[in-house]
Amino acid sequence: MNGAYDQIMGVFNWIRSCGRATRDFAARFQRETRGNVAMIFSLSLPVLVLMTVGGVDIHRASTVRINLQDALDAATLAAARSPYTTDTDLSRVGLAALRANLQAYPDITLREDQTTFSLDNDSVVVANSKVDVKTLVANLILPPYGKFMDDYLPVGAHSEVNRSSKNLEVALVLDITGSMGGQRLTDLKIAAKDLVDLVVQPVQTPFYSRMSVIPYAVGVNLGSYANSARGTPTSYRSITGATWTTGSSRSISGITRASPGVVTSSSHGFATGDWVWVSGVKGMTQINDRAFQVVKINNSSYSLQAWNGSSWSTVNTTSGNGYSSYSSAGIARKCLLSDCSVIVTASGHGLSTNDYVYISNVSGMTGINGSGYQVTELTSNTYSIRENGADWGSYSSGGRSYCGQYGCEYRVFRNPSNAIRALPASTCVSERIGAQAYTDASPGSARVGFNYANSSNTCPTASILPLSSNTSTIKNLINSLSDDGSTAGHIGTAWGWYTVSPNFNALWPSSGAGVRNERDLLKAVIIMTDGDYNTPYCSGVIAQNALSGSGGSTDKINCNATNGHSFDQARALCDGMKAQGIIVYTVGFQVSSGSSAAAILAQCATSANHAYLPASGADLSDSFKAIGRDITRLRISK
C-alpha cells in the first residue's frame, strides 16, 4: 500500500508542478498584448491542462497492464495444462481462470469478446486479452473539442505457454525471528500469500507447481520429521535409589577453637577414616555444610580433617583461621563417599566418569530434580553426582536419569562461566557438521544436528512444510507464523535446499522432490531475512562466539561454532545449490545496502538481478511479486 501511495503522490506532485508551470506560462501570456498570441493561448490552454491531469489515467492503465499480464500468464498456464486441444475448450478453461484471477480488480472490465486462447502448430498455447479501465480524469468534456479521452482506456496483454513446459518446485525460506515482530510480520504474511498465488497454480496436470515453506529462527522446527533427520534422542533410565548417608545422625555438643579443633559428640560411633557431613552448628557456622574425614579420639570426641585438593589435612578452628566460637547445636552424618555426594542407582545407566546427567521425577529427595550434574561412575548401575543432598530430603521412589551428552533427550554442559546448564532437545535442528555439511546428502547417511533450545530463545512453534500444491495449507501456515528468537539463517537456507532435494524424500515420501532434470523441472529457493545471521552451534547448543542478538551467555556452551560464522555457512550452502542449477533468490527486508547482511544476500543469489532489498511492506510485496513473475516467465515462452 505504501508503494502505491508513493506512486500516486508522485504523479500528483508532477501534476502540481506542471500546474505551476502552466500558471506562470498563462501569466506571461496575459501580459502579452498581441491578439494572435492571446487567441492561440486561449485555445491551447485547456488541452495542456487536460493532457497534464490525464497522466493520472495513464499511470493507472500502466498498473492495470502489469496486473493483467500476471493474470493472463496464470490463465494461459492453466489452459496449457488442460488436456484440451480445441480453441473452444482452451478458451473455456483459460477464461474461467482469467475471470478468477481478475476478481481482485473490480475497477477493470474484462473484454471477453477480445480474449482468445488457441493452440498453434508448435503446441504453444497463445493468449491475448483486453480489459477496459475506467478513466478518472481524462473523460472530461472539453469545449469546443468534446471529450478529451473516452470513458474507458483499453489495456491489452499477450502470453504464450509451451505445452512442453516445466514442473516447478519452490522453497520459501522465511525469517520469523524476534526482530520480525509487529508490522514486519504482517507485511511478510501479505507478501508471501500473494507469492503463493503466483507460483502455485490450481491445475496440476500435465505439469505441477509446488511450494515448501521453511520458517526459521533459532533453528528450523521439523516437527514429526525431527527423529528421522537428526536421530531419535537417547531416553532415560529409571532411578531406583538415591542416597548419600548411612546410619543415624549424631548430635554435636561442642567444638573447640584449636588446631585441631575437637568435636564433642557422645557415643558418636565414628571410626578414624569415616567421612561425615557437618551441619546445623550455631556460632562456629564456618564448619557447616562441609565434608570431613574423622580422626577418632575416643567414643565421645573426634577431630576433623578436610580435603585440600591433594590430601586430607587437619582442620584448624582457631580465630586466626577465621572460625567463630561454638555456641550450640549441630549434627554429623556419616557419608558413603568422601565428598558426601549422592549415589544414584539406575540399572544400566550407561554413564562414564565426567559425563553429565539430568535428573527428574524423583519422589522424596525432590531437591535433586530439574538439574544437571557431572558424574563419577561407580558401577554399571550406580554413579555419584558430586553434590551433597543433605537439604534435598530422603529418597522414597521413582526418578529418571537422562544422559546429558549430545544426542540425548537433555544436553548438560558448561557455559562460558563454567556453570553447569541443562537444556532439553527440541524438534528444531541445528546445522549438519562434517564432510556433508554443505551438501544435500540424505539424512540417512549424514544426520543433521540436534537443537537444545532455552526458554528465552525457543524453537519456533511453526514447523516446516514440505512441497505442497495445496494453497490453503500453505497460506494457513503463513497465517499462523509468530515471531520469536534469534537468527540461524544458515539453517533456514539449508532446509530450503533440502526440501527441493530428492535425497531428502525419505523424510516425506508423499511430498518428495523430483529428480533433477533441467528439461522438465525448475527448482528455486527464495531466502528472506531482515538482518544478520547470528546463531551458529557447537554440539547442539548456541556457540559461545555467536554474535550479538543470539541470547545471553548463560545458555551458551563453552565452545566455538563447529562450522564457523552463520554467514559463511549460508554462502557455502548457496554455492552448493547453485552448482546444481537451483535458482536462488534473496530478499533482505529493510536490510541496508552496503551492510554485511546485504553482501551475503547478494553473494547467495544466482545473480544481482535475483537479490532484492525492499525498504517497506509495499516494496516487499513488489519484490515477491517480481520473483513470482520471474519464476513464471521461466516456464512460459513469452
Tell what function each PLM region has.
Residues V173-T177, L188, Y216, G496, ...:
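DG-centered beta-turn motif at the end of beta-strands
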Residues Y225-S248, V294, T314-L337, Q374-V375, ...:
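Acidic, Ser/Thr/Gly/Pro-rich low-complexity segments that form flexible
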Residues N2-S17, G55, H59-I66, A71-T135, ...:
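Short amphipathic secondary-structure patches
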Residues T246-D274, S279-V412:
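Small/polar beta-strand repeat architecture
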Residues L50-D57, R163-L188, I527-D532:
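MIDAS-like acidic motif and immediate structural context at the N-terminus
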Residues F25-S44, D120-A171, M180-R184, W497, ...:
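Acidic, polar low-complexity linker/tail segments
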Residues L98-N101, L573-K638:
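Von Willebrand factor A/integrin I-like adhesion domains
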Residues M39, D70, E169-L174, M211-P215, ...:
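Structural recognition of the beta-strand scaffold that forms the well-ordered cores
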